[in-house]
Amino acid sequence: MASEPVNGGEGIDGAREKQIIKVYKRKGKGQRKQSSFFALEAAIEKPEGLLENENDNNDVSPAETLAPEFEDPIVVVKNSIEEAALGTNSHGDKNLTEAPSENLPGDDSDKVIDKPLVEAFSQAQPQDDASLAAMDKSEEVPSQIPKAQDDVNTVVVDENSIKEPPKSLAQEDVTTVIVDKNPIEAPSQTLSLEDGDTLVVDKNPIEVSSEEDVHVIDADNLIKEAHPENFVERDTTDAQQPAGLTSDSAHATAAGSMPMEEDADGRIRIHVASTTKQQKEEIRKKLEDQLNVVRGMVKKIEDKEGEIGAYNDSRVLINTGINNGGGRILSGFASAGLPREVIRAPRPVNQLSISVLENTQGVNEHVEKEKRTPKANQFYRNSEFLLGDKLPPAESNKKSKSSSKKQGGDVGHGFGAGTKVFKNCSALLERLMKHKHGWVFNAPVDVKGLGLLDYYTIIEHPMDLGTIKSALMKNLYKSPREFAEDVRLTFHNAMTYNPEGQDVHLMAVTLLQIFEERWAVIEADYNREMRFVTGYEMNLPTPTMRSRLGPTMPPPPINVRNTIDRADWSNRQPTTTPGRTPTSATPSGRTPALKKPKANEPNKRDMTYEEKQKLSGHLQNLPPDKLDAIVQIVNKRNTAVKLRDEEIEVDIDSVDPETLWELDRFVTNYKKGLSKKKRKAELAIQARAEAERNSQQQMAPAPAAHEFSREGGNTAKKTLPTPLPSQVEKQNNETSRSSSSSSSSSSSSSSDSDSDSSSSSGSDQT
């Protein structure tokens, strides 16, 4: 209800009057509507004499002040109240116009103030009497505008006061807000809150850069942690759109960095969906550069491996195979861990593959020369020495003892329980024993039970898979080649004692084929490991160095092992029966000077490991047109030739000594014939040059021609009569006949070649 007028002459002590104050919220143009007002109870004391004269219509009342419990008062203006913002009493005309307040926003046209007298509140809230203080007449109205409360957790701004609102608002539990660079302009306003607090907003625009962090503080002034799941990634397609809340990766993208993140295991993940075309192009270029670097490193590694493999010049296996393009492949099976090397030559027909069973004691000559300084080698093991009493006496050959010890020094390295090669050998042995034919070979042969009285006469070194397994578990094998040798010996004994066509012979052939296929993979892995362990990149002796060192003692017998009784095996002499020849009978106690058996000798000795190695090297150097002759020699008395994938494979371990020595004679005759051809070719060149000189001398009067001959490195000058043209033709005919005879003699036996050479040399002297 409206308040009654108060006469200036009447003093009413303690009179209280309830008034209603209407406050309107300012809104934008065209959207101005009357908002809900709130009632504020204000008990204002009007002391006596405050209003002077009613007739003068100069009613002046002090500015209304809230009770003390309202810390932030709201300053309002009536037509009869002084202007609180200026801090002075206004005395004007009888009807005072409204006084603007500095606290209200906008210009004069936007002011919304209640002009009539203030109406009393319909519902009054009780106030504390102690909080209502009487004001004195002479007391001036305070000119200071009350400040906004510090404890603010809600900001109310005009909807149209911001030019471009942010795309996504900050959440309550987010500490970082990225707003657009466009300034936020908000006029100064006095905003009311629900609990009676006020907040004054300055007119100055708020400018926040797109990368500036704005912290939102709650009512308790605590900064809450940001949760990544509440982040909203920024849309980078439109540069004009303001950014929302972004995660670390999106923030890095906005800053211009690559959208990459690294996992705990070191791998880098690239978010392709959140990248631009320019960033994708940069990533692609970087990946291509890194790929080129990796390819370069791989090429360098391959070149280095090729250089290391070039040192492998000893071959134990000659594997001449068919290539798809009709080429000849000669691959060497290197002992002591050297890799296989492939040499290609044109060869359009079926090829020959001759494999030599590697002896445990036989080691590459390179390893032998390296082991001459055992103290400097960390892989030198005294436990692998051969027994001295099993070798020739020291006075006969001291060098053979030291070299034989050194041959076994490095072979056993890297073969023991727990190694990869050991596990592979054990798995292969288990497969052979579990085969359906394996039961025949899993235990030693029961000679007495089966009544095989001649078994030990034919088979000198019995072996079975059960004994091999026991030796393998006890770590008695010093190298995987010893293991392979015993496995082969088991099946070779069965094939030797049981003729072809019997079941045991067929079983042995089947299991041996399975073993050879699996063993090739194990052996390749072992050779690869040994190549890096033994250090073959060191200075290796050249062939000229080996020739200066002289011949070395042949290795011990092939079948001398540390698995069973070595002394018994080494002391046995080979005993053969008519019609059957043991495959691995090697006599012991040989003298260093071993002579090659003659062609007509009935019982030829077995080749030593070194002799087989030399033979394989000579066979490798043969031209392609001589390989057919090798196949014919092997097929004469041997059935070990296998045709597989257009490749002829021959296991030299199963070839009898007679065939091996015949191959050796074939190589020797070829070398002799080659030397004769060279000598004849040199003579033919000299004769041709001499004929040219004679033809020139016929035109010029020259009584004699000079022939230079070198004997013992000294040049002697001889004066010979000039031959006639008929003599030159006769000499050329003799040269052609001698060259044809030497070529025909290359395929004959050694005795025939010797007679041919003597006859040809006699004809040369005449």
Curated annotation (Swiss-Prot):
InterPro entries: Bromodomain, Bromodomain-like_sf, GTE_bromo, NET_dom, NET_sf. Residues 597-678 form the NET domain. The keyword Protein biosynthesis does not apply. Residues 238-250 have a biased composition (Polar residues). SMART domains: BROMO (SM00297). GO terms for biological process: DNA-mediated transformation; positive regulation of mitotic cell cycle; root development. Keywords: Bromodomain, Nucleus, Transcription, Transcription regulation. GO terms for cellular component: nucleus. Disruption phenotype: Cell numbers are significantly reduced in most of the organs. Cell cycle reactivation is delayed in germinating seeds, and a premature switch from mitosis to endoreduplication occurs. Furthermore, a partial loss of root quiescent center (QC) identity is observed. Ubiquitously expressed. It is found in: Nucleus. Residues 416-522 form the Bromo domain. Residues 574-589, 736-766 have a biased composition (Low complexity). Residues 87-108, 234-262, 388-412, 544-606, 687-766 are annotated as: Disordered. The NET domain could serve as an interface to localize different proteins or complexes to chromatin. Involved in the activation and maintenance of cell division in the meristems and by this controls cell numbers in differentiated organs. Its action in cell cycle regulation may be directed through the RB-E2F pathway. PANTHER family: OSJNBA0053K19.4 PROTEIN. This is Transcription factor GTE4.
